[in-house]
A protein has these predicted regions:
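Glycine- and aromatic-enriched low-complexity segments, predominantly in secreted/extracellular proteins
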Residues: 7-148
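N-terminal signal peptide c-region/cleavage motif recognized by signal peptidases
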Residues: 2-4
Length: 148
């Protein structure tokens, strides 16, 4: 009368807090892309690439082109986008986030006092994170061998 049923639960947790740029917004454990409405540019977080239109083609580059030399990436608003190839729907993002142009009230990782961001090697508190990693062993297997 009784049937045995087995359930399998798969939990996929993605984290990339330590690899997000320090100019990115706080509050996200994982980010695929940022969209920057001020300059209509995407940034691929895992690949560390800017994606922008040039002569009708999407360009993937490690830095912004010279036409954005006056853009302050620390102050510009960034929209977190976690979907594949959002630049293929750029018109949707332009329209949806046009109201965020010139919005400079977003807290960025570099200015955060949240210790989860200290893992980022470019964060001002990174050395505190490194020190905490070195002292987490509490004398058990932390590489400090003992001679008898």
């Amino acid at each position: 009368m009784f049937q045995n049923a087995q359930a399998q639960v798969h939990v996929n947790v993605r984290l990339n807090v330590g690899t997000q740029p320090v100019w990115g917004p706080v509050g996200y454990d994982y980010v695929d892309y940022y969209y920057m409405p001020d300059i209509d540019v995407f940034y691929n977080v895992p690949r560390h690439q800017y994606i922008y239109l040039q002569s009708g083609h999407w360009i993937f580059a490690s830095s912004l082109p010279s036409r954005y030399h006056s853009y302050d990436i620390n102050r510009g608003y960034k929209v977190v986008v976690n979907e594949p190839t959002p630049y293929h729907n750029a018109a949707v993002y332009r329209t949806k986030y046009a109201g965020y142009k010139n919005n400079h009230g977003q807290e960025i990782i570099r200015n955060s006092h949240d210790s989860r961001y200290w893992e980022n090697k470019n964060h001002p508190e990174h050395n505190k994170w490194k020190a905490s990693q070195n002292s987490n062993g509490n004398g058990h297997g932390n590489g400090n061998g003992h001679k008898n």
